[in-house]
Amino acid sequence: MAEDATSSHPSRYVKLTKDQDAPAEDIRPGELNQPVHVPQLEGRRCSECGQVLPESYEPPADEPWTTGIFGCTDDPETCRTGLFCPCVLFGRNVEAVREDIPWTTPCVCHAVFVEGGITLAILTAIFHGVDPRTSFLIGEGLVFSWWLCATYTGIFRQGLQRKYHLKNSPCDPCMVHCCLHWCANCQEHRERTGRLAENNAVPMTVVNPPPVQEMSMLEEVEEKGAEKSEHDDVEVIPL
C-alpha cells in the first residue's frame, strides 16, 4: 500500500550522492545565520528613541526661548532660588532632562565644585593673605573649576535644547554657563516649567443643560380634551 502511494506521489526532495553532498568541515560556524538585508530599516533614525524615520521626514525647526537670558525678574521665586541656592535649581533642571538621575546628585556636584570652590578661595585669601603667588594659585584654581562647571552644566543645557528644539541663545551652551551661569540656570528652569504648564493644560468643554420645560394649565386641559375625543370616536360594531 505504501509502495503504491510512493509510486503515485513521487518525493519532492532531491537525494544527493556522496559526491554531491558537501563535507561538514567546509561549513563555517555562523555561515547560515547571516543577517537579513532590509532596506527599510537602514534609513535615518531618531536620536532620542532610535525609531526609523520616513524618507519625507523633516526635523522641526529650532524655536527661540520663551524668556530671555536676562528675564530673571519674570519669575521672582526662581530668581531667589537661583541666586541663593543655585545647586538646588540646577539639580531640578537636570532631573527634568534626565529622569534616571535624581536631583540630589547634580545638586551635590554643583555645591562641591562651584560653591565649594568659591568658599575655598575666600577662606584661602582670608587666612593666608593675598600675595602675588597666592593670588595666582587662587585664580588658577577658580578658572579651572569654573571651566569644568561650565562644561558640565552646558551638557545638560544642550539636552534641554534638543528636548524642546531650542536655539542657542545667546551663544553656545557651555559659553553661556561660563559667562552667565546664574542667569542661564534660571532661564532653563523658567523654560522647563513653562513647557510643562503648556502640556498639562487641558481644554475644557462647556456643556449647557437643556432648558426647563413647563406645562401650563391650558395646555394640560387641551391635551386631556384631545385624548377624550380620540376615545369618543371609537365605534362598537355588533357581531
Curated annotation (Swiss-Prot):
Tissue: Expressed in roots, leaves, stalks, apical meristems, immature ears, endosperm, pericarp and tassel spikelets.
Bias-annotated ranges (Basic and acidic residues): 16-29
Bilayer disposition of the protein: Multi-pass membrane protein
Cystine pairings recorded for this chain: none
Alphabetic keyword roster: Membrane, Transmembrane, Transmembrane helix
Lineage: Eukaryota, Viridiplantae, Streptophyta, Embryophyta, Tracheophyta
GO cellular component: a single term: membrane
Protein name: Cell number regulator 6
Transmembrane feature ranges: 107-127, 136-156
InterPro entries assigned: PLAC_motif_containing
Family note: Belongs to the cornifelin family.
PANTHER family recorded: DUF614 FAMILY PROTEIN-RELATED
Species of origin: Zea mays (Maize)
Ranges annotated as biased composition (Polar residues): 1-10
Location in the cell: Membrane
Phosphoprotein found in the keyword field: no
Any Pfam family hit: PLAC8
Region of interest (Disordered), residue spans: 1-33
